[in-house]
Curated annotation (Swiss-Prot):
It is found in: Cell membrane. It comes from Helicobacter pylori (strain J99 / ATCC 700824). It is a multi-pass membrane protein. This is Flagellar biosynthesis protein FlhA. The keyword Cell membrane applies. Belongs to the FHIPEP (flagella/HR/invasion proteins export pore) family. Pfam families: FHIPEP. The gene is flhA. One of its GO terms (biological process) is protein secretion. The keyword Transport applies.
Amino acid sequence: MANERSKLAFKKTFPVFKRFLQSKDLALVVFVIAILAIIIVPLPPFVLDFLLTISIALSVLIILIGLYIDKPTDFSAFPTLLLIVTLYRLALNVATTRMILTQGYKGPSAVSDIITAFGEFSVSGNYVIGAIIFSILVLVNLLVVTNGSTRVTEVRARFALDAMPGKQMAIDADLNSGLIDDKEAKKRRAALSQEADFYGAMDGASKFVKGDAIASIIITLINIIGGFLVGVFQRDMSLSFSASTFTILTIGDGLVGQIPALIIATATGIVATRTTQNEEEDFASKLITQLTNKSKTLVIVGANLLLFATIPGLPTFSLAFVGTLFLFIAWLISREGKDGLLTKLENYLSQKFGLDLSEKPHSSKIKPHAPTTKTKTPEEIKREEEQAIDEVLKIEFLELALGYQLISLADMKQGGDLLERIRGIRKKIASDYGFLMPQIRIRDNLQLPPTHYEIKLKGIVIGEGMVMPDKFLAMNTGFVNREIEGIPTKEPAFGMDALWIDAKNKEEAIIQGYTIIDPSTVIATHTSELVKKYAEDFITKDEVKSLLERLAKDYPTIVEESKKIPTGAIRSVLQALLHEKIPIKDMLTILETITDIAPLVQNDVNILTEQVRARLSRVITNAFKSEDGRLKFLTFSTDSEQFLLNKLRENGTSKSLLLNVGELQKLIEGVSEEAMKVLQKGIAPVILIVEPNLRKALSNQMEQARIDVVVLSHAELDPNSNFEALGTIHINF
């Protein structure tokens, strides 16, 4: 009997429901009235869940429509829809606020299952974390997405309206010239008018999105404060229970409201930034086409990811996998082309599974394409593929890329001496610092400006500059009698002011006191300084092995004993020395110290490095002597140094200075001021001598502050050398 009544009721109501759906205007009116009813009428929890679900679904639907339309005006109803959806979401905020304040004391489940689920999921037992997550979501929506969307719509509306007269004149010109008829002209004018109306409406509608984001913040505060007061003073809830209950509900309500708001704001930006597209290609296809248009960009991304995968501490597998994937896609695209790649995949699937995946009309018989080139054997194809992959994956350790006008500098047949200069650099680095830098790969790069060059370390640009191959660089070192004419520039290695002068003015420049440098020397000097700057990066495990093998020829016992020490520890000590410009020529002393100390300190690199530095006192003192044979230095006053010693904090075997902002600023200013006085006297580098316990921590602090000061300790000075104190740094901490 009940089934019969249900069938009868359904039979009577379905025609009404059908007419309601067919009458679109009536459906919209009912929807708007329902929004107003939501604001006024209290709703049971299951109805509220239903309405919140509709809100999320609508936002997802809108952003998908925004992605699939060909041009913005295809979604001309979007500004009005934006207003209605915003009103609907604010009505839901009112309804959920009412429910939270009136039913929240009964527990989260009495309000809404969706709100409770979102709240408990995000909070995860920690209300502070939940509040932070919600705050981040609100700030991202308000400050990033909403502000960006609003600005885009404003600018797009302004440009669309400014372009109206020109577009109208273009339509009239086409009509007058007979390129289009009256019907086509009317169609274009209508589309132009629709575009102007759309962007004008979007300019105003975007303000709804921003207002909605601000309103949600205020509503959230009301829910928390109001709910807490209601729970404590009206429902006699404890402070903790009231706070936990209403925090869960408020955060859940905020998330349920903010997620659709964020999606709608994103959809607004997508629609506003869409350009008129080709009808033959949708947005997603065009996006993929443009992202993969240049296979070399995929190669660069993949190579960089593989490089990052070699850095300790980073996720090796993830970076290597994604990097290899990018390189593989780039290789496939460069070899087959995007269309050819898809065609090949389509043919393979068709043959393998008997599927017809072609979208184009075709005959029942498929005629094979006649080969236009000689068929390659599988071995040849495999060899070419391996060579292509090897070429893509190979990263030169040190590379010098030249613009096409600079190629002559490296061509000995044309009188270029750049290669000879580079060989001289390798000898000089080996003599001064004690390691052999790798060969520099010199190649041309047509993508560079003609007179520019780049120096790369492991595929990453570490320096670049510009030289004029037919001119000379004239540098004013402070002894110029009279300035000469030239093209102003910056010397790339040291950043000093200089001039590019013609060869005919070279002798005159020398007479007037300028230092003259030829283009090859400019590049070579820049390369040399960069090698010194990044010297620690050249100490690979292979280089450590080579250093030990050379030392073993004369001192086999110490090298054999050092095999008990991990190669990584030896390498880290060498890198730490080079990082602070300490030569590693005296490998015998370095290795003896490491083998003596390492077992006692469990191979701790920090302690080993400081002990090695103390044993290298003669090397360090000699490295920083002035031309007159004296080590000229600065020191701290007793009070200042004692203050810094008191601020040292130990972190395992390392130490750091624990200074507040004011103390750190005073330290930086005090050291910088005295260092500048030393530099003005023509003395470089600036040496600062401190207590051994303070040296490493202060050196790290100076490096972070980008103050070019060499920090040495008393233990690192050769007592038999000559010294000259240049001043004392007094800091009133």
